[in-house]
Curated annotation (Swiss-Prot):
Summary of the tissues where the protein is detected: Expressed by the skin glands.
Species lineage: Eukaryota, Metazoa, Chordata, Craniata, Vertebrata
Biological process annotations from GO: defense response to fungus; defense response to Gram-negative bacterium; defense response to Gram-positive bacterium; hemolysis in another organism
Official protein name in the record: Antimicrobial peptide 7
Organism: Xenopus tropicalis (Western clawed frog)
Modified residues (Leucine amide): 18
Length: 18
């Protein structure tokens, strides 16, 4: 499904914000 890639993107963006 799309949840896998979306979670990966969310994690990457979150780490960038930190």
């Amino acid at each position: 499904g799309l949840l896998g890639p979306l979670l990966k993107i969310a994690a990457k963006v979150g780490s960038n914000l930190l």
